[in-house]
Curated annotation (Swiss-Prot):
Methylated by PrmC. Methylation increases the termination efficiency of RF1. HAMAP family: Rel_fac_1. The gene is prfA. GO terms for molecular function: translation release factor activity, codon specific. This is Peptide chain release factor 1. It comes from Aquifex aeolicus (strain VF5).
Length: 362
């Protein structure tokens, strides 16, 4: 059975749905194109949860009737009623779970593409190799989901690691799945650079940002400082005789981005701007969240960049996600992009936390 707070919220949403239907049938609303469009959008957003709630109430009514038939003196009728009770109980469980998911406020960024940024942290060359392992893991996961991965900017090391790599991941549900990956990832293993066979701990930081439509962020030309320089390769040597690499500084925030992977200055500038827009949107949203958190005194799923979220332990073939105390002994599978088990568990936890807020708000 759904909790009273959920039923109360569903009743309110259903009432809102009915009122919207009434509004949309009024001649004055039909004639007002903008208002009609706005109300139609609201109605569409509530349609699925309204239909689910109707199915839930219908199943609840049928279950009550089937339970009454269990008292019948007719043996055949009782057997049929028992089957119906079992079927309806299962159906109601499924509908309850679906309704809970729909009660959680939607993240407007869930439908967006992703700007993925991985930076090597503590651990020198080994940290850079780990950053490359993480990038490969996300590439494999994207491949499995049918998403497209394009490198926007990268800084490779001599051994094939990454000091930093930034990529655009395009595809349905990319942000809704990958947003849980932001934070510090830690690896424990014997590095290829280690001759004595000792286990080292290294880190890499992952940031997952929604791709931003440039119309969402207003930047004045005078707020940008654009510099060009010659692109350099893994060993630091120059790989280009002309200044094709681009560095852009957003003066008000101090955010700096650079790109040198493309052959032309124009292409590098376009890619750098794409990264900058995503970082600025993230910067402003985080500031807004901090203000809300101060008022609310609590914050759901902060995804702090400095938070250690996961450990990859090679000697034990173990992956531990510290946010939900989930441990899996299938490290190689995870590194091959089998991330759904972890992401599903994180998503379930987020829904649970947000439902607690729904309960409080009633």
């Amino acid at each position: 059975m759904l909790k009273e707070a959920y039923i109360s919220r569903l009743d309110k949403l259903q009432e809102k749905y009915r009122k919207l239907q009434e509004e949309l049938s009024k001649p004055e609303v039909i004639q007002d194109v903008e208002k009609y469009k706005k109300l139609s959008k609201e109605l569409k957003e509530l349609q699925e949860i309204n239909e689910l709630y109707e199915r839930y109430k219908k199943a609840q009514k049928e279950l009550k009737e089937a339970k009454e038939l269990l008292k019948s003196s007719d043996k055949d009728l009782r057997e049929l009623a028992e089957e119906e009770v079992n079927r309806l109980t299962e159906e109601m469980k499924k509908l309850e779970e679906e309704l809970k998911v729909h009660l959680v406020p939607k993240d407007p960024n869930d439908t967006k593409n992703v700007i993925l940024e991985i930076r090597a942290g503590a651990g020198g060359e080994e940290a850079a190799l780990f950053a490359a392992d993480l990038f490969r893991m996300y590439q494999k996961y994207a491949e499995e989901k049918g998403w497209k991965v394009s490198i926007l900017s990268s800084n490779k090391t001599g051994l094939g690691g990454y000091k930093e790599v930034i990529a655009l991941i395009e595809g349905e549900g990319a942000y809704s799945r990958l947003k849980y990956e932001s934070g510090v990832h830690r690896v424990q293993r014997v590095p290829v650079t280690e001759s004595s066979g000792r286990i080292h701990t290294s880190t890499a930081t992952v940031a997952v940002l929604p791709e931003v439509d440039e119309t969402d962020i207003k930047i004045k030309p005078e707020e940008l400082k654009i510099e060009t320089f010659r692109a350099s390769g893994a060993g630091g040597q120059y790989v280009n005789t002309t200044e094709t690499a681009v560095r852009i500084t957003h003066i008000p925030t101090g955010i700096v981005v650079q790109c040198q992977d493309e052959r032309s200055q124009f292409q590098n500038k376009q890619k750098a701007l794409k990264i900058l827009y995503a970082k600025l949107k993230d910067y402003y949203e985080r500031k807004k969240q901090e203000e809300i958190a101060k008022e609310r005194k609590e914050q759901v799923g902060t995804g702090e960049r400095s938070e250690k979220i996961r450990t990859y332990n090679f000697p034990q073939n173990r992956v531990t996600d510290h946010r939900i105390n989930l441990t899996l002994y299938k490290l190689q599978d995870v590194l091959e992009g089998k991330l759904d088990e972890i992401i599903d568990a994180l998503r379930a936890k987020e829904i649970e936390k947000k439902l607690e807020l729904v309960e409080k708000e009633g």
